[in-house]
Amino acid sequence: MGRRSTSSTKSGKFMNPTDQARKEARKRELKKNKKQRMMVRAAVLKMKDPKQIIRDMEKLDEMEFNPVQQPQLNEKVLKDKRKKLRETFERILRLYEKENPDIYKELRKLEVEYEQKRAQLSQYFDAVKNAQHVEVESIPLPDMPHAPSNILIQDIPLPGAQPPSILKKTSAYGPPTRAVSILPLLGHGVPRLPPGRKPPGPPPGPPPPQVLQMYGRKVGFALDLPPRRRDEDMLYSPELAQRGHDDDMSSTSEDDGYPEDMDQDKHDDSTEDSDTDRSDAESDGDEFGHRDDSERDNTEEKKSGLSVRFADMPGKSRKKKKNMKELTPLQAMMLRMAGQEIPEEGREVEEFSEEEDDDDSEDSEAEKPSQKQHKEDSHADGSSAASSQQQAPPQAVPPSQIQAPPMPGPPPLGPPPAPPLRPPGPPTGLPPGPPPGAPPFLRPPGMPGIRGPLPRLLPPGPPPGRPPGPPPGPPPGLPPGPPPRGPPPRLPPPAPPGIPPPRPGMMRPPLVPPLGPAPPGLFPPAPLPNPGVLSAPPSLIQRPKADDASAATIEKKATATISAKPQITNPKAEVTRFVPTALRVRRENKGATAVPQRRSEEDSAVPVAKAAPRSGPSVPVSVQTKDDVYEAFMKEMEGLL
């Protein structure tokens, strides 16, 4: 990279003489700084001890090439440290090569010695690691010469040999005992015993029968086993074991019919018992126990392939019981809600589970009449519940028109949402159904019929009407709100019996308080027919032609005619609302200020009249100029001051 000229920029533009001088001065400064930096680096390198650097590198090598202990630092960290130390050592070598060659030669010797030590460490480490990986079995052994014949095998103690007895001494000169020799059966490499020596005896204890049989077949003579041994040996014979197993299988397959018949008899007995004892709850529990046992037996008979099924076995009772078992309390409750007839078995299941759930229910269920009457009651009750559910949906009837039946005890899930007051008039056409807040399948505990198990529901919220207890205030039909001033409103006349009462959203109370800000002390005598319009018609502005035209257009365009002028009942309060707070002055002389206040009130009502067309229909209003507004303001000030 060549040097750039100081008279031009990087792109070749001619530079200002001032910039040229600044650039040259900066170049000189950088050159001087570079010399200083080189001197600082040389001084730092001279301060470092090269022998210490070599020792640090040796420590790193010992840590890395240690076959016993894993290195504490990571392999990458060790490489980085050695690289930095080596670079520093080479810089010191270059420095001393220029300045002091004698020190340079000494440092070279140190480096060569370090490299030799490092190579030795690495070689030892590799040898140990390779020895750890090599398997011992793969190492070839040298060929061993044959054992000399003068070595006696008897002198070598065998692990299973019995030591010679101390008590009984056998004479070498006595008659030799005959022994069955089994030496030819052994390997050929074993040297023979010298004459006159006995081979070591067998291990203590009788030999196992398998060994005796094997050697009896090989040598050629039969061995007579004791009867106990022969019986034990039969256990090891595969043919006999197979034959015995077949006999056992045939006997078990013949005997399998007996438990099956017993189970069938027990199954039929349980069927008859359950048919006769249906009205008793305890017999229900026993019946379920029998049924579970019979179901378990049936599944075991299906699984085992050894059972024999005959053609004359009755199979319908099992199917019937299975169908009876499958009717759960939930299905029975849904059948009852739909108004259908519940099978006897399912209903008793439901009653049994419910008797366990309801601890504080009445004892009327214990004294049950005959089965037929109970069935008719439950059927009629289910149909009445379904009809009341169809006739009285909770949303279609306001709570003020429907009265819940009187509750003799605490209801299942909370207080009954029944307003205490009933509006006067003829009774409505709807029968009193369940309360609007409760789900349709919940009945008060006083009503007859089968109670289903209580579902896990959230407790209902507050009742739709007023809280119980008639506080002084509006009757239950009105929505809660600020108490209306004036005469108390009358209830709407109740609907004739044939027509359902209107929804709560459609009923409007006859007298609603006005929405606008009322004067502090009084109530306006007539309510506004359109509370959305907040001002009077623009006929307040004293311009006769424009006022007549605008009033005519109002009557043509708007559906509701605005005919009331602002009735100022408290002029002082109304005027001071439009005045800045700093100018609110109260005078004792009311007679002198009454007329200007009335006039200023009429002027101050103009901004409200201008704001009116935004909320209501579009009304053409004559625009006031700044002079008119200023003149009205000055008149207002004159009236106040």
From Swiss-Prot:
Composition bias (Low complexity) maps to 381-404
- Sequence segments annotated as region (Disordered): 1-37, 186-213, 236-549, 588-623
The coiled-coil regions, if any, are: 75-133
Biased composition, Polar residues: where in the chain?
1-11
Which residues fall in a compositionally biased region of kind Basic residues? Answer: 28-37
Which positions carry Omega-N-methylarginine? Answer: 192
The record's region (Interaction with PP1) falls at 217-221, 306-310
Q: Where is the composition biased (Pro residues)?
A: 192-210, 405-447, 456-504, 510-530
- Glycyl lysine isopeptide (Lys-Gly) (interchain with G-Cter in SUMO2), cross-linked positions: 557, 572
UniProt function note: Activates pre-mRNA splicing. May inhibit PP1 phosphatase activity.
Q: What is this protein called?
A: WW domain-binding protein 11
